[in-house]
Amino acid sequence: MSLAQPVVAIIGTRNPDHQQERKARFLSYELSHSHNCTISTGAAYGIDEAAMKGALAEKLNVYLPWSSYNREIIPDRAKIVVASERLHPHWYASVTKYHPAANRLKPGVRSLHARNYGILEHADLVIAFPNADGGGGTGQGIRIAEALNIPVMQFNKGAESVLFSCMLSNALLYLDRKKTDAIAA
């Protein structure tokens, strides 16, 4: 972890409810503007888009499955990383390792899931806004984060606002503790 800039991945559903979208945008804003965090996300419509809108563009890493993916919603000054099987073979290997039906995925979907590994691989914390069934790319992201021992905080549809406040407080405490531990080491 970088002492100056912890990395927080914000991932989630493409069909968020209004509260999920607002909370993703707020968390991204608060973490990047007030707590010097880099936000890592994937440029899908929905939660990823909300995270991009909230983040300070200079502290935003956006991971794409292919170069033309949703470019119109990515802020100009964001850092963009495009998945490439040649450059990121471990991203693609992660699909086979963590996806329950990897052998049935079409190439484009495989690239979407591969880029999930890129979003998470340098994260200190993952904040996830899954859909009701918890599957899809967000489910894949949660499986990857758990395998990499990255803490995951989930905010599901219908969660209480108290949970949101606790989640932000816990996220900040966790990041402060990691920073303190790194300084002491």
Where are these regions (language model features)?
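Acidic/glycine-enriched connector segments
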Residues: 2-7, 14-168
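Short intrinsically disordered terminal tails
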Residues: 1, 178-185
